[in-house]
Amino acid sequence: GTRRWYGNNSNVVFWKNNGEAIHRCEGSVFRNSDFYFKSGITWSGISNSGSTFRMCPDGYLFDSNKGPMIFESSTDLNYLIALLNSKISAFYISMLNPTLSLQLGNVVSIPVVGEMNAKHDCVLELARNNISLCQRDWDSFETSWDFTTHPLVKLKMASANPWGNNNESAIRLST
């Protein structure tokens, strides 16, 4: 599915001994390994529902099917993901590449206004909030590696005790 800001982390790579088993596979190619396991911004390589950009934290790999990644300092990543998920970037992308396959070259062609922007700090805060909200949403599904409890179970547990207290008070008042 299409997710914006965070998520779609679904595959596990057996990386024991620096990927030794994968290195032994005929035809395996390792490119840009200096960037492996570093945080960045990624997107689906092919999409028919528009481009959506997601934060990919430390500890992940990237490939051409999931989409390339952009690596910057963490502040720049938050600013960039806000820009990339904006309507203006969607417009630029539709002009630069009106196909289903979004390439890194198209993404880096989007003009970026840095800290000269008066709203820079506000944009950073909104981006961090969006990433946090989307991470909580992603982690509320069993497909997330960080899933613990479904949110409805938490809601039921939180609401069960006040309901019991209210009923107990009502019963005392009626007797």
Regions found by a protein language model. Give the residues of each.
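Charged, low-complexity surface segments at secondary-structure and domain boundaries
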Residues: 1, 20-23, 65-70, 165-175
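Segments forming glycine/polar-rich beta-alpha architectures that bind adenosine-containing cofactors
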Residues: 1-62
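Short, solvent-exposed loop/turn and secondary-structure capping segments
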Residues: 6-8, 94-95, 135-137, 142
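Generic surface-pattern signal
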Residues: 17-20, 85, 89, 128, ...
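Hydrophobic alpha-helical segments
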Residues: 30, 99-100, 160
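Basic, amphipathic alpha-helical recognition segments used for DNA target recognition
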Residues: 34, 44-109, 116-119, 133
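Non-catalytic DNA-recognition/assembly elements of restriction-modification systems
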Residues: 109-175
